[in-house]
């Protein structure tokens, strides 16, 4: 604890195991607490690393696994956005993560007027469903 906000979050998610979709020695695939959208996923290293591209095949394998699980549950090619958040060269005080946001719902008046997202699927339920997918 105390290494970084993302590091602390990953450590707590690994400890609780409620929202984990898949995990290995190097990385973890999580349905994040307070997800903005149904079936949102976050891939992060279990130990802080600055760049995704330097972390070996584990992260890529878990990302592939998560996308496969989403496709099995939501249909062969669910619409989604994917962000790779990785440090620029030379920056070491950073921890990579990848966010996957399936586009299953439409923004309506409440979301647009208040900037509040309504997620109709609890992340714990999403994780359980995707673990079985």
Task: Give residue ranges: language-model regions.
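HIT superfamily nucleotide-processing domains
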Residues: 1-133
